Regions:
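Sec-dependent N-terminal signal peptides
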Residues: 3-14
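Flexible, glycine- and charge-enriched loops at secondary-structure boundaries
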Residues: 4, 94, 181
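Hydrophobic transmembrane alpha-helix bundles
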Residues: 27-28, 32-33, 40, 94-103, ...
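N-terminal targeting sequences that direct proteins away from the cytosol to non-cytosolic compartments
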Residues: 18-64, 69, 175-199
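Generic detector of solvent-exposed, compositionally biased contiguous segments
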Residues: 41-69, 125-159
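A short, structural micro-pattern
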Residues: 59, 76-78, 166
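Short, well-structured beta-strand
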Residues: 134-199
Length: 199
C-alpha cells in the first residue's frame, strides 16, 4: 500500500509538472508597471535563470534595453536596466548583490560563447536609500565585453523595494559604462521613478 501511495504521488507530480505552462515573455502580463520607452527593447524570462542557475530565486526578469545598447559607437552602449520580480521577502546586502551579479555575468559571457578565464569582478556598497526604496546600492561590474571583445567596467545602481502585501520583492538594476553624471542615467532613473507596484 505504501509503494502504491508513493507511485501515485510520483505520477501526480509528473502530470502536474507536464501540464505547467511554459513561460512566454512576449505574452506574460506583468502585475506591476515598468515603463517601456519608445524604441527601447523589452525582454522577459523566468528566474531561475538558464545561464545563471546558481542564483537562488524564483520569479521573472524584465529587461529594458536602450536603442543603442548593442552599438559600440553609441553613448547608450551597454546601457540598460532590468527588474527582478521575485517570490517572497528576499533578503539582500552588498555581498549578496556582488555574488549574484558575478554569477549572472559569468553565465551571460559563457552563454555567448566566450572563454570566462578572465574573472568577473563586482564591487558594491550600500548607500543612502532613494525615496521608496528599502535599500539602495551602487557599484561596478568589470567583465569581458562579448560584443566589443575587450574588458569593460559597467556602473550599476541597485534599488530594492517590497510592496504593501510583502509577498514579492523587486530588485531593479540600472547599468551603463558611462559615469553617473552622464545624461543616460536620467533615462534609466526615470524607469524606476515611474515604477508602480500595481498597474
Amino acid at each position: 500500500m505504501k509503494i502504491l501511495a508513493i507511485l501515485f504521488l510520483s505520477l501526480s507530480f509528473v502530470i502536474s509538472y507536464a501540464q505547467a505552462p511554459e513561460f512566454n515573455g512576449r505574452t506574460w502580463e506583468a502585475p506591476y508597471h515598468l515603463s517601456s520607452p519608445a524604441n527601447w527593447g523589452v525582454e522577459r524570462f523566468p528566474i531561475p535563470i538558464d545561464f545563471a542557475p546558481q542564483i537562488p530565486y524564483k520569479g521573472v526578469e524584465d529587461i529594458r534595453f536602450t536603442p543603442g545598447w548593442a552599438k559600440a559607437a553609441s553613448d547608450e552602449f551597454w546601457s540598460y536596466a532590468f527588474l527582478w520580480y521575485l517570490e517572497g521577502d528576499v533578503k539582500t546586502d552588498a555581498k549578496i548583490i556582488e555574488n549574484n551579479l558575478q554569477q549572472y555575468y559569468h553565465g551571460l559571457i559563457t552563454a555567448n560563447g566566450i572563454d570566462t578565464s578572465n574573472a568577473v569582478i563586482t564591487t558594491f556598497k550600500e548607500i543612502a536609500k532613494d525615496t521608496h526604496d528599502v535599500k539602495t546600492f551602487n557599484g561596478t561590474i568589470q567583465m569581458f565585453d562579448y560584443m566589443a571583445k575587450q574588458t569593460i567596467v559597467i556602473n550599476c545602481k541597485v534599488h530594492v523595494k517590497i510592496c504593501k502585501n510583502k509577498t514579492k520583492t523587486f530588485i531593479f538594476y540600472e547599468l551603463s559604462p558611462k559615469p553617473l553624471s552622464h545624461i543616460i542615467w536620467q533615462s534609466l532613473d526615470a524607469l524606476w521613478t515611474e515604477f508602480k507596484c500595481k498597474k
